[in-house]
Amino acid sequence: MKFLSIISLAVSLVAAAPVEVGLDTGVANLEARQSSTRNELESGSSSNCPKVIYIFARASTEPGNMGISAGPIVADALESRYGASQVWVQGVGGPYSADLASNFIIPEGTSRVAINEAKRLFTLANTKCPNSAVVAGGYSQGTAVMASSISELSSTIQNQIKGVVLSAITKNLQNLGRIPNFSTSKTEVYCALADAVCYGTLFILPAHFLYQADAATSAPRFLAARIG
């Protein structure tokens, strides 16, 4: 898979958009099976709930509601493990436009409407399928969406969330590498040593786009261990 750079130099310091990078052949071959938009939670029936519901928030400027990087890769791995019929995949879309400007919003690092949309989806999962295992993920600005939304959920809904994987977490320094008010044992953070975003800045370096291997391997393994 390759990514298209669509950000000008003037805004590159705050962008979380994919740029063109080469990936290994195994990951690249996933492209044909992945979709940038998934809405199984919203469209699925409560009479046919799956084993797993995966909710994901994409990076800035990524297309659809899942993007074309970490989210679909993790989704594919979960579907391969549990079977497509036993995994509902849902991207955070609608009010969450994944725009660049929202990265500047302090202290959340994303918009209030985006946070509320993610909270709505977690609540929907709980009301529609309370016995399904909910897992979640985010990439770049999407990690800010997930961190804020999950931290504001009721304990009942938080308890249904079995695990969360966050890649290139934009609030890593500010949140001390965790989701506030949420169990650290349920959270896995992937932040590359060379990714400046992980140190409390919005400087975008090449390492910010190199999380596909984690998304294909360690992230789904962590979630599967939490799901059981």
Curated annotation (Swiss-Prot):
Key word Hydrolase present: yes
Entries under InterPro entries matching the protein: AB_hydrolase_fold, Cutinase/axe, CUTINASE_1, CUTINASE_2, Cutinase_monf
Disulfide bonds listed in the record: C49-C129, C191-C198
Protein EC: 3.1.1.74
Gene Ontology BP term (one): carbohydrate catabolic process
Regulation acting on activity, per entry: Partially inhibited by berberine; higher inhibitory effects are observed with longer chain polyester substrates.
GO molecular function term, any single one: cutinase activity
Family, similarity comment: Belongs to the cutinase family.
Protein name: Cutinase
Organism of provenance: Colletotrichum truncatum
Taxonomic lineage of the native organism: Eukaryota, Fungi, Dikarya, Ascomycota, Pezizomycotina
